[in-house]
Amino acid sequence: ILIDLAGLWSANRISIFNTRICPVQISWLGYNNSSGLKEVDFILADVNTVKEEEKYYGPNIYKIPKIWNSHCGFDYKRTYNELPFKKNRYFTFGSFNNFMKVNDDVLSTWIKILKKTKNSKLILKSSLFVCEEVIKKRFEEEGLINSIQFEKKTKRNDFLTHFNLYDKVDLCLDTFPFNGVTTTFEALWKNVPVITKAGFNFNSRCGESILKNANIANFIALNNEDYINKAVYYANNIDKLEDVRKELFEEIEKSSIFDTTGFSSAFCKALNDMILDVNKNYR
């Protein structure tokens, strides 16, 4: 079995698949949509990430029962910290996603949230200076330049500094239609809920799948208005948000998203099923 982890991203090895060097070739994890290659037999997904559009995919879709991706957790002891709001007396939203995922629709939505929540702030983590300047200009035009804060990119060997940034955040905001994945796992491990928006394809449903499997599906918005309303609601209902954070602290490690043992079993079964399927077609 050959597994593609890059798809059409830069520095990919997609040409290897053209030669059909393995009887079973699948796409998983790194590139969540079809690459268009007929030599890719399967895309590994789940029931939440690929729905009615499945018929438009070239490869077969294999749906793992719970979630297409699981995380082993992070090598840092989990602690429960009170909401930053209680110390700051202002509400802090955060999004540490790659700036490539931050489009005009996302910015407009975040701006509306900040305008509806008095004395609130938004922390973004920047690695692209040009994007940072564009975003600053947009917020300045909206009279919100003092409501945005940028954290600089941390070094790869200094993950703890990055991880501790979540201690400054009351509620995380996901990007759309290209959702975060690693950042959502990080936030939930740190007991910080994430507002996401359900989308129309695999990449735009990653947040939906993670939050459903984390048992906080009520943080999944159906549209932009719902996204805004949910963010504003929790900013104005601190006790409700704190209840969710406490629940995450107590339960998140037991959920499907961090159940690597259960996921490994499902993953191995998936690979075996794919081999059987390909062998059947060769007979």
Language model features with spans:
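A donor-sugar binding/catalytic signature common to diverse glycosyltransferases
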Residues: 1-12, 16-37, 158-206
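Generic beta-strand/beta-sheet core signal
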Residues: 4-5, 45-46, 96, 125, ...
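Generic, well-ordered alpha-helical scaffold segments in large soluble proteins
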Residues: 5, 109-116, 138, 142, ...
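Active-site-proximal region of nucleotide-activated glycan assembly enzymes
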Residues: 19-79, 83
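Conserved catalytic-core segment of nucleotide-activated headgroup transferases in glycan assembly
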Residues: 66-157, 161, 165-167
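C-terminal amphipathic helix plus adjacent low-complexity
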Residues: 96-99, 112, 124-127, 134-137, ...
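Catalytic binding pocket for nucleotide-activated donors in carbohydrate/polymer assembly enzymes
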Residues: 175-260
